[in-house]
Every structure is written in structure tokens, then in C-alpha cells.
């Protein structure tokens, strides 16, 4: 359980899961492709401040990671240690009864004793396997919250619930605004030839946000989860797997085209939605249909096992009655790779001339007057000197103040010195002489509790003070800000509509 080198028998959360996570982080620009947070990505006053916000975001995760580890460890101890056997049994019985009431009310017993609840669960398993799968998943996913509700005292439980409500509200409001903005800015406006007036744009933005809220409510009301929550995140996030190809290749490859971008988005979405449907309908619909045709089932079994064979045990596909042979992370990876392939192939087929990247990114002759001039990073890297090369690799430029540089170097030292350094040391050490189990216990206690608590305490005080200061500054700037009506998100002739006067000025001076 604790030794990460002993994961060959794991089907879902193995080394391939980690590999896909690393690949997705690079491919997606460390979260830039997750459109649920695009409001944060686009809210900075300029590109430099956006870069600094991402640097600060690395320190923000210390306390969160520690809380996840602590609550999980507490729940595991409570449900497995002999000293809490009676209390844990009562918690499990109550949880199963609540899950039955949620998934299959007809099977929920009137008497919530252990024997009655267990018997009802067994009847559900025998009579409705598909619904039992949802029941079993919810029971597993709700174990930690159920344990916390039983062991926390009244006041502390109330504070914890209040914190969860605050987090849910901030997340849902951000997501509704982000997805509503995407519907208006990236779908409605490009298809509409006549631009919106500011009043129309705000009206339709509010309508879109309302539609997103209604959809989220209906989806949550009718959807039954059948897989781990992290796998659910992976497969639903894969709906926008094509966004990585659009952003990364669109910014760094001048032959990318709009047709290639649409194909990448459509291919990624189709694979994700198709995989999501297969995962949820496999037990109740898909597999029974396959079982009715033994020849088709045999062919699918042979084909699937032949494809995954070279990659076993990290990718292990087996056609079984209980679940779809691909998990959410594998579907996510397939969607990303397919989106990249679709973008490249279609762009090469439809590209007539290279796109002017300098014009779009304000480089060279297209640099704006309010932007600091600095040689590109690859030009800086050609200069001699270790510090110059390191500066180019880290992305530190003339926009960085002394405080910004201190923050950036602190993240570099933390990520490469502590994070990558300890990782590499532990890997080499264990390849030569594997650690005993107790050493892993000590290591995770130091890294996940001690170090994380220090980072969490420092960052909490730091962000509370700095966040309050920046919030007041933002309100002051908003009071003085005068909106540019042309800067409404439209793209004309390959650039933002707000940049057209600047381009016209350059053309007149040429």
C-alpha cells in the first residue's frame, strides 16, 4: 500500500496513471486547457502577472495536500483498526443504508441493522447488477465523509461543513462563469457575423451561465457514478482533450489551421463522450448485447488483449461483465493522442501559408509600445554563461521585480531541489537497496505531513496578507478602469479586435 515500487498488480492507479498525469500536465500547459478555470487564466492584468499567479499557485497546494492525506489516514485507521471495530461497523451500516436509499430506494430496509442492510445489498446485487455497481461506487467514495461525520465533534464538524460549502460555492461560481463565457465567446461570437453590443454580450453571458447551472443540476440529479472519482475526473476532463493541441500547437506551430483545431476538439470530445457512455452502460446494456453474440464477444476479447499485451501489466485490458475494459485515464490518453494526430494531419492538408505568429504574439515589429523589449529566450540561451542559460530556461525576464525573482527561484529550488531531488535519490536508492515498509511510513510522514504543514502554515499567513492587499488594489483599479469596447474577445484577421488599431498604425508607418 505504501511502497510505490510495488504497484505492478494495481489495475487503475499504477505507473501508467502517473505517466498520463505527467503527460497531461505538459500537454495541457499545467492546467491551461481545463476550461473550467479559464476565468482565472484570463483574469490577470497582463501576461507577466498571469505567470506570477501560476508560480504562486505552486505554494498554495501544500496545505490542501496535507489535509487530503490526513483525512484519508484517519478514515483508514478508523475502519481497519481493532480498537474502533464496533464504531466502524455502525458507520458502514449507516453508509450502506444511505447509499441504498439514494440509488435504489425500493431496496432500502425499514430496520437499519447490519443484517437487514447487508441482505438488501445482496438482493440488489443479484437482481440489478448495474444499479448495484453505482451503489458500490457511492459507498466507497462516501466512506471518508461518513467517517468524519461520526468522529468529529459538533463544533468542528460544523466548521468543516462550512468550509466545504465555501469551497463548493467558489468552485461552482467560477465554473459557471467560465463555461458560460466559453459558450458566448468561443461558440456564439465566432458564428455570429455581427458583434454584440456590451449590453447584449452581458445579457447572453447571464443566459449562458443560467443554462450551465441548469445542466449541472440535471446531470448531478440523474447521473449514477460507476467508477472512481479520479477516473471520473479523467474521462470528463478528456471531453476537452483537443484543447491542448489547439493551445500548444496553435501557439508554437505556424501551420496550424482552424480546421485542424475543430477536428482536434471534435475527435477528443467524441472519444471522451463515447468512453463515458460505454463505461456507464457496459454492465447493464453493452455486455449483455455482446454476450448474446459469442462470436463478436470472442473477437473483441482477442483483439483487446492483443492490443494491450505489449504494455502489460501497466495497461491490462480484459473484457469482463462488470466493467468496461478501459479506465478513465486510458481514455483520456487516447483522446489526447488522437486529438494531436487529427490536428496535425488536417492542418497539413488545409494549410495554404504559414501563420504570422509574430503579429499574433506582439513580437518583433509588432511589439506594442507598453511592452518591454527583450530578446527571445532562445536568443538569450545562445549567450555564454550558466546563469544566462538558466535564466532563459526558467523564463525570468526583464518584467520580473526583485520580489518576483525571489518567488521564482524559491519555486525552482523547491521543485527541482526538494521535489525532483528527493524523487531521484529515492528511486536510485531503491533500485540498489529496496526500502523496508517502515521506511516508507517515515518518508511519507515527513514529506506529506511535516513538510506540508510547514509550507501550509507559511503560505496561509502569506496569502492572507498578500491576497487582502491585492484585493484592495484590484478594487481601486476597477474604479478607475475604462473598458475598451473593442476588446470583447473577437478575433479579426488573425488578431484580437482590440489590436487592429495598433496593426493599422504599423501599416501606416511602414
Put a short name on every predicted segment:
Residues 480-504:
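Solvent-exposed, non-transmembrane helices and loops of integral membrane proteins
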Residues 504-510:
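Long, low-complexity, intrinsically disordered segments
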Residues 1-462, 485:
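Membrane-embedded helix-loop-helix hairpins and adjacent transmembrane boundary segments
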Residues 456-480:
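Membrane-helix interfacial anchor on the cytosolic side
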Amino acid at each position: 500500500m505504501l511502497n510505490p515500487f510495488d504497484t505492478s498488480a494495481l489495475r487503475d492507479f499504477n505507473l501508467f496513471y502517473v505517466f498520463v498525469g505527467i503527460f497531461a500536465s505538459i500537454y495541457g500547459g499545467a492546467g491551461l486547457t481545463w476550461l473550467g478555470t479559464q476565468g482565472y487564466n484570463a483574469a490577470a492584468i497582463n501576461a507577466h502577472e498571469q505567470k506570477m499567479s501560476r508560480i504562486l499557485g505552486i505554494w498554495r497546494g501544500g496545505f490542501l495536500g496535507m489535509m487530503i492525506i490526513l483525512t484519508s489516514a484517519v478514515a483508514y485507521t478508523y475502519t481497519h483498526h481493532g480498537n474502533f471495530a464496533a464504531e466502524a461497523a455502525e458507520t458502514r451500516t449507516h453508509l450502506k443504508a444511505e447509499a441504498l436509499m439514494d440509488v435504489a430506494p425500493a431496496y432500502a430496509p425499514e430496520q437499519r441493522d447490519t443484517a437487514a442492510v447487508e441482505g438488501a445489498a445482496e438482493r440488489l446485487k443479484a437482481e440489478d447488477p448495474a444499479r448495484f455497481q453505482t451503489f458500490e461506487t457511492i459507498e466507497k467514495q462516501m466512506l471518508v465523509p461518513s467517517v468524519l461525520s461520526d468522529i468529529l465533534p459538533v463544533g468542528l464538524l460544523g466548521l468543516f461543513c462550512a468550509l466545504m460549502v465555501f469551497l463548493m460555492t467558489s468552485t461552482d461560481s467560477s465554473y459557471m462563469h467560465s463555461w458560460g463565457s466559453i459558450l458566448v465567446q468561443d461558440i456564439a461570437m465566432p458564428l455570429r457575423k455581427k458583434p454584440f453590443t456590451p449590453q447584449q454580450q452581458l445579457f447572453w453571458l447571464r443566459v449562458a451561465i443560467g443554462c450551465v447551472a441548469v445542466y449541472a443540476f440535471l446531470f448531478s440529479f440523474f447521473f449514477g457514478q460507476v467508477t472512481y472519482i479520479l477516473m471520473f475526473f479523467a474521462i470528463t476532463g478528456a471531453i476537452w482533450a483537443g484543447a491542448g493541441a489547439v493551445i500548444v500547437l496553435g501557439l508554437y506551430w505556424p501551420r496550424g489551421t482552424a480546421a485542424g483545431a475543430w477536428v482536434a476538439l471534435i475527435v477528443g470530445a467524441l472519444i471522451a463522450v463515447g468512453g463515458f457512455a460505454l463505461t456507464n452502460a457496459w454492465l447493464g446494456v453493452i455486455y449483455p448485447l455482446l454476450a448474446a453474440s459469442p462470436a463478436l464477444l470472442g473477437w473483441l476479447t482477442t483483439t483487446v488483449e492483443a492490443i494491450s499485451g505489449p504494455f502489460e501489466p501497466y495497461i491490462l485490458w480484459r473484457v469482463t461483465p462488470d466493467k468496461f475494459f478501459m479506465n478513465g485515464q486510458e481514455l483520456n490518453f487516447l483522446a489526447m493522442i488522437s486529438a494531436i494526430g487529427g490536428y496535425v494531419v488536417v492542418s497539413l492538408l488545409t494549410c495554404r501559408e504559414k501563420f504570422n505568429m509574430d503579429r499574433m504574439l506582439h513580437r518583433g515589429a509588432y511589439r506594442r509600445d507598453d511592452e518591454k523589449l527583450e530578446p527571445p529566450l532562445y536568443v538569450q540561451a545562445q549567450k555564454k554563461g550558466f546563469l544566462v542559460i538558466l535564466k532563459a530556461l526558467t523564463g525570468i525576464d526583464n518584467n520580473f521585480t526583485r520580489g518576483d525573482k525571489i518567488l521564482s527561484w524559491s519555486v525552482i529550488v523547491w521543485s527541482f531541489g526538494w521535489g525532483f531531488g528527493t524523487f531521484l535519490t529515492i528511486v536510485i536508492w531503491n533500485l540498489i537497496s529496496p526500502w523496508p515498509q517502515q521506511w516508507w511510513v517515515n518518508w511519507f510522514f515527513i514529506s506529506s505531513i511535516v513538510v506540508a504543514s510547514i509550507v501550509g502554515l507559511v503560505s496561509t499567513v502569506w496569502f492572507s496578507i498578500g491576497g487582502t492587499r491585492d484585493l484592495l488594489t484590484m478594487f481601486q483599479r476597477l474604479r478607475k478602469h475604462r473598458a475598451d469596447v473593442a476588446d470583447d474577445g473577437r478575433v479579426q484577421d488573425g488578431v484580437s479586435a482590440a489590436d487592429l488599431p495598433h496593426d493599422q498604425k504599423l501599416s501606416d508607418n511602414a
